[in-house]
Swiss-Prot record:
NCBIfam families: ksgA (TIGR00755). This is Ribosomal RNA small subunit methyltransferase A. It comes from the Bacteria. One of its GO terms (molecular function) is RNA binding. Gene3D superfamilies: Ribosomal RNA adenine dimethylase-like, domain 2, Vaccinia Virus protein VP39. InterPro entries: KsgA/Erm, rRNA_Ade_diMease-like_C, rRNA_Ade_Mease_Trfase_CS, rRNA_Ade_methylase_Trfase_N, rRNA_adenine_dimethylase, SAM-dependent_MTases_sf. It catalyses: adenosine(1518)/adenosine(1519) in 16S rRNA + 4 S-adenosyl-L-methionine = N(6)-dimethyladenosine(1518)/N(6)-dimethyladenosine(1519) in 16S rRNA + 4 S-adenosyl-L-homocysteine + 4 H(+). GO terms for cellular component: cytosol. Belongs to the class I-like SAM-binding methyltransferase superfamily. rRNA adenine N(6)-methyltransferase family. RsmA subfamily. It comes from Francisella tularensis subsp. tularensis (strain SCHU S4 / Schu 4). S-adenosyl-L-methionine binds at residues 14, 16, 41, 62, 87, 109. HAMAP family: 16SrRNA_methyltr_A (MF_00607). Its EC number is 2.1.1.182.
Amino acid sequence: MQYKTKAKKSLGQNFLQDENIIRKIVQLANIKKHDIVVEIGPGLGALTRYLLSSSNNVSVVEFDASVIDTLIANCQKYGTPHIYNQDFLKFDISSLENSSNQKIKLIGNLPYNISSPILFKVIKDSDKIVDAHFMLQKEVVERIVSLPNSKSSGRLSVILQYHFDCSMILKIPPEVFYPQPKVDSAILRLKPKNSKELLKNYNFFEEIVKQSFAQRRKTLHNNLKSILKERKIDPSTLPVDTNLRAENLSVGDFVSLANFLS
């Protein structure tokens, strides 16, 4: 592996370099030859090489043009991925060569500074994917997989858990990266749910979740006061206790609340 390229702090780059960890990630992602795999932020190709050994159809989306020559050189013995030199946030998954309309597997070591926008984009593309395996800050993964009545619960966890079964499947120490980050990392698995609770208005559901967590220390009654007043709704008639905080509610509670207020 060549590591000539200097990691760019502005892009949140930390290059994965431990072969055992990389093999473990690919194994956990359960990638087969027929799978269509898209890697987000391949960097220097440490993970890409193993993906090319596992699948016949690997695409990579890399924003940083300066790493692409090194990426190609590092992958040379294993094959050539389809390279898209662009921002994943603007990438159209439908543009992939996929004549059979086969769903894809997403994987990647996500830049810490834009992990949330990427996850919200993945939500929009959830009907096109089989699953996703992302490396993120361990603290972020813990928030995403958190259960009701946890102080880690938040907008991101509720929205993601509405769409996906979310699980933390591997913890990763800082020393397996170059340069070493100051935090631990973990692998998040997202698997689209086969069936979701029906919502009358999805956008309104997102708005209710956002408003409910607007000020975490406040109760639902205080955070949703303007919405309740606008709709002339008595808080005592709601399907949830508005004296609770947002962190106390389950995804199902938020669905019931949004449907009631729609």
